[in-house]
């Protein structure tokens, strides 16, 4: 199985990082995205608007990929990152911890069905992931092993919508897409692509993570952030159509193309139906599921039952937020 490459530049950053005392609870949170904001980030954008209404200054920055966003968190350029940096924590001993599960892994291997009728046809063939160390790469590693194949050249293209366009233009032939872009590709190019079987996958796709010292010194800000995430996720799980309504009310992503705008309701309805947005923010149960998945996928070393949750997660914030919103 092809072994992923992990955050080489970050090892130096983590090792050389000095740790000056931070200002006590600044009521500000700087969040780094390793992707552009689009349909699948609308739930986060809605929650962040609610955080702002509670007096927290929110700054959202899009980086070119998750590696760069992770480095920004480690170096203190932003406070919070989004991803699943288990390998970064284990291999580089970066001083960061996951603290909230945003979504579970729901990606689909969409391929040109004439070229790749099944998994075996992909043996030795190119495959495209979102980024190094991403959930899509872990999923690809696992599925390749389960199907007895090894991919050929691996490329990394951040952004599911970017990969969808590349598929339809014929620039790539096989990749993972999220729900919205899988539906879009199937609608716009009927009969050309199909989704290969994946079986059951139970793992985090995106989680919030931050430097442990920042989490401990900004407890009130973190509490507000997580309370609003919990409430927003629960609102969406009760009524997925609220996302489109809130987007319009708040003026979010005003330049979203019409074809993607049409995917808002289908995306969130399907995502809710597949339990993509946890009501509880994850925590210990999510960590244990992640250990099983990411060790099997080759992104974590060791036996899942021997890994310590506290080495990767800081559980106190989500537990306090759940208590505050009753559940």
Go through the PLM ranges and name each one:
Residues 8-18:
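Bacterial N-terminal signal peptides
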Residues 19-23:
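Sec/Tat signal peptide C-region and signal peptidase I cleavage site
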Residues 24-159, 164-169, 173-179, 193-202:
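Short, glycine-/small- and polar/acidic-enriched structural segments
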Residues 58, 151, 254, 301-302:
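Residue-level detector of short coil/turn "hinge" positions at structural boundaries
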Residues 85-86, 162-254:
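Pocket-lining segment of extracytoplasmic ligand-binding domains
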Residues 217-301:
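Secondary-structure end/capping motifs
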Residues 288-327:
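Conserved C-terminal helix/tail region of periplasmic/extracytoplasmic solute-binding proteins
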